[in-house]
């Protein structure tokens, strides 16, 4: 006990007493402040504080000089009820240094704001067509986050870096948006006059030249690229319409002739269609030399113009005399279809009553068709067809027509 009293008296009167007094004053200051945070964390970004400067000489040297006495003090005052002093000393003792944001960024460890800016840069570069609104919403939602990042305990040099990164990413996103808006094309709404003029030009020539395209662009007040794309789409539509007619005419060209003649008679074609002239899609077998020459010299020897297939197929058959196209043997190879005796009987029966042969001089087809019929080695007949043609009976024919009973055959039912 005496040794302990001597130690207490020595502490009260000695040099260690003064040091402990200084420590106790520091402890009282620390207890008076509610949260002992480091000074650099408490300082906002544009403000300077007297405590934010470099530490004083007492704080620099106090760590090494006072560490041993504080440990000795804690060991000696353990039995004398000096737990508050030892706790305060342990609290005020030099702990591990808190690494600043500058040191973290210098060591290569990315902070949270840098990671977020990199993540948003990757998102903003891949811009959608609605990127203008997306950028506005993103900037609006990002503003509170940037304020929170600015008030968070980071260094002053980190905030301009993050703001610069987000600004650069925003400019990149704006450039990407403008490029995508320029790449996006909107559907052009043509007027009826423009469509009529373009259709007329397409019937005249499928492939329009560039000078003609420039004239059309100036006349219709349309871009030249739009006219070019319209002609491309129109050619594809023409091709689809031709392919839609592949059901009858590869096996039976006469039925295709009937369909085209019916379309021309109903007003589906902007030009007359001669049913007696051979189709340019085929090489007819059985034609004489004069007939082939007249067909080649005719203005219809080029490719056929498009027709509205669905309008033709949806209408009933009002003109039975147009079926004379089925009674023309030159469109078929003789031995293949068995036209021997039936063709001879049809030739001896009488003249034809088809539209192309007996139409008036108004449409200008009578002389040409008559010359073709006279030059060929057959005579057009008005009698009923032979049974060899009934295999390709179309279901679009009306049952009320005079030839409906012949067209409908039980062996080959066709349903569409």
From Swiss-Prot:
May play a role in the specification of neuronal cell types. May play a role in the dorsoventral specification of mesodermal cell fate. This is Homeobox even-skipped homolog protein 1. PANTHER family: HOMEOBOX EVEN-SKIPPED HOMOLOG PROTEIN 1, SEGMENTATION PROTEIN EVEN-SKIPPED. Pfam families: Homeodomain (PF00046). Residues 102-114 have a biased composition (Polar residues). InterPro entries: Even-skipped_HD, HD, HD_metazoa, Homeobox_CS, Homeodomain-like_sf. Residues 72-82 have a biased composition (Low complexity). Its main location: nucleus. GO terms for cellular component: axon; neuronal cell body; nucleoplasm. It is found in: Nucleus. One of its GO terms (molecular function) is DNA-binding transcription factor activity, RNA polymerase II-specific. One of its GO terms (biological process) is embryo development ending in birth or egg hatching. Residues 183-242 bind DNA. Residues 30-120, 138-178 are annotated as: Disordered. It comes from the Eukaryota. Keywords: Developmental protein, DNA-binding, Homeobox, Nucleus. Belongs to the even-skipped homeobox family. It comes from Mus musculus (Mouse). The keyword Amino-acid biosynthesis does not apply.
């Amino acid at each position: 006990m005496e040794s302990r009293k001597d130690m207490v008296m020595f502490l009260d009167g000695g040099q260690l007493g003064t040091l402990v007094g200084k420590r106790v004053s520091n402890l009282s200051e620390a207890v008076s402040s509610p949260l002992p945070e480091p000074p650099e964390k408490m300082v906002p970004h544009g403000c300077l504080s007297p405590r934010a400067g470099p530490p004083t000489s007492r704080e620099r040297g106090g760590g090494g000089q006072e560490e041993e006495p504080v440990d000795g003090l804690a060991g000696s005052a353990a039995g004398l009820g000096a737990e508050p002093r030892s706790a305060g000393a342990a609290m005020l003792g030099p702990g591990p240094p808190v690494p600043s944001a500058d040191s973290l960024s210098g060591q290569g460890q990315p902070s949270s704001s840098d990671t977020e800016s990199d993540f948003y840069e990757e998102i903003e570069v891949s811009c959608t067509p609605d990127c203008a609104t997306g950028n506005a919403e993103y900037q609006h939602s990002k503003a509170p986050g940037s304020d929170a990042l600015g008030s968070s305990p980071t260094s002053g040099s980190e905030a301009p870096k993050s703001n610069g990164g987000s600004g650069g990413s925003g400019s990149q996103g704006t450039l990407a948006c403008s490029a995508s808006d320029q790449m996006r094309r909107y559907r052009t709404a043509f007027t009826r006059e423009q469509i009529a003029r373009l259709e007329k030009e397409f019937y005249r020539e499928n492939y329009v030249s560039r000078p003609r395209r420039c004239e059309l662009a100036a006349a219709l007040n349309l871009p030249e690229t739009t006219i070019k794309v319209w002609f491309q789409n129109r050619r594809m539509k023409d091709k689809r319409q031709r392919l839609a007619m592949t059901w009858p005419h590869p096996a039976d060209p006469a039925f295709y002739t009937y369909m085209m003649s019916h379309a021309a008679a109903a007003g589906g074609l902007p030009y007359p269609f001669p049913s007696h002239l051979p189709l340019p899609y085929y090489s007819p077998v059985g034609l004489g030399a004069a007939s082939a020459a007249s067909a080649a010299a005719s203005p219809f020897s080029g490719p056929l113009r498009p027709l509205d297939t669905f309008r033709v197929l949806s209408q009933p058959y009002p003109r039975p005399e147009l079926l004379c196209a089925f009674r023309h043997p030159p469109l078929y190879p003789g031995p293949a279809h068995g036209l021997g005796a039936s063709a001879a009987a049809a030739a001896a029966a009488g003249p034809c009553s088809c539209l192309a042969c007996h139409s008036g001089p108004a449409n200008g087809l009578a002389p040409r068709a008559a010359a073709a019929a006279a030059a060929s080695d057959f005579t057009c007949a008005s009698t009923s067809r032979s049974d060899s043609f009934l295999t390709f009976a179309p279901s679009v024919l009306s049952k009320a027509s005079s030839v409906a009973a012949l067209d409908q055959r039980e062996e080959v039912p066709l349903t569409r």
